UniProtKB/Swiss-Prot annotation:
The species this protein was found in: Mycoplasma pneumoniae (strain ATCC 29342 / M129 / Subtype 1)
Free-text cofactor note: Binds 3 Mg(2+) ions per subunit.
Gene Ontology MF terms: ATP binding; lysine-tRNA ligase activity; magnesium ion binding; tRNA binding
Enzyme class: ligase
EC number, UniProt record: 6.1.1.6
Protein name stated in the entry: Lysine--tRNA ligase
Residues at which Mg(2+) 1 binds: E399, E406
A UniProt-annotated Pfam family: tRNA-synt_2
Any one cellular-component term (Gene Ontology): cytosol
Amino acid sequence: MSDRLNDQAQNRLQKLLNLKQTGNDPYLITKIENTHSAASFQKAFANQSDAELKQYQVILTGRIIALRQTFIIIQDFSGKMQLYINKKTAPELFEYFNNYIDLGDQIVATGHPMMTKTGVLTLNVERLQIVAKCLQTPPEKWHGLTDPEARARKRYLDLTYNRAQVEVFLKRTQIITAIRTFLNEAGFLEVETPILQAVLGGANAKPFKTHYNALKGDFYLRIANEIALKKLIVGGLPKVYEMGRMFRNEGVDTTHNPEFTSIEMYQANADYAVMMDLTENLIKFVCKTLNQWSFNWNGQTLDLAKPFKKVKMVDLICQVTGVNFDDVKDDQTAIALAKQHKVELKKHEQNKQHIINRFFEQFCEHTLIQPTFVTHYPKAVSPLAKQDPHNPEFTERFELFINTKELANAYSELNDPLEQRARFEQQLQEKRMGNDEASELDESFLDALSFGLPPTGGLGIGVDRLVMLLCECSSIRDVVFFPQLRELK
């Protein structure tokens, strides 16, 4: 505790010291066997007569959220309960209440149920004990924690005084359970792959780096688990998925957290079209589980019941900007178009394929409100995807956008080890030109491919973003228990 306590905190601390001196140390209590939760208390006794209620002995536990005269309101995970202390029939109990109890204290109370004159089911307390003293003043009852950063920084208070936030996390758990149920029923095997990786790969992103003392080498926290999962397909597993944490050493904003939850799945003898159907069916299964198909986001109504739209990237660019990249035959023409449309390019982006991707990011992403599969990404930005047999500049790849945000990324997996090596070498060239998100050459993965990866479809879904959408939350902080925050100084 700080030496500079305010008056209220000092008073609370003194009450704790007094409790200990009188032999009532709350921290010596190791176990509580309550008979009811708030919800089960209401369900069990709300419709019984006074005579019937007096027959029961009930033990309740919870945190005090309101005090008024001889009434206490406590809260547990299931709801709220009212307690009553009769100062005439239980003077010693009232003295304990008066001398030691504060808002925020965790207590255990024993007594019998009763109905007040106003018809409120209440516990008539016969024994009362603090089990954890609240030594700081809790948030004000009606306004609580309102600052979003303070809520995320002190999630333990946010969950106590903001029931709506609790409901978000309950829904998050329901969504994750539904995803697993869908995949398990579809015959996918849940697996675990390494978080520490010697070679960077599986996505284009900046990594976190650490040093592995025992192996005397630098390792990365994984930016994706794609490579390891595809090795399992080479090993003969037909359908695999993994849900877990990924780490990307990049910016923090309302839709990005450096540590995030993602799910990736791979299916042998499938392509990107199969994964497209899988994506839509999975999301609709989750909506069915939630019994909700329409979602509101910044004034937009998103309808997930209708079939998801499909559009090629170059067609969408043409619709939005009027530029038809199918007619562009060389890099110089593409560079001129980028300059004309004020599209800034990095050194490694001075070519048609990267410019197509930059046009899409700058002009098209923000137009994608209803669920839309954007297909056929340029090969230069898809180093692990199989090229389109009808147009080798592009790949059999899609990303799903809903309300301008990317939720899923999938493709027909490149399974030609010679072509994959050439793609990796192209990525190394881009890295030398300043692309710090480029993949590294992964000899272990190339070795696995050389033993034969069957045609495979792969899919990754950002779980946090999906939860944001389905919980109608505007910030990723609201759907992550403990988001990364800048250190207070």
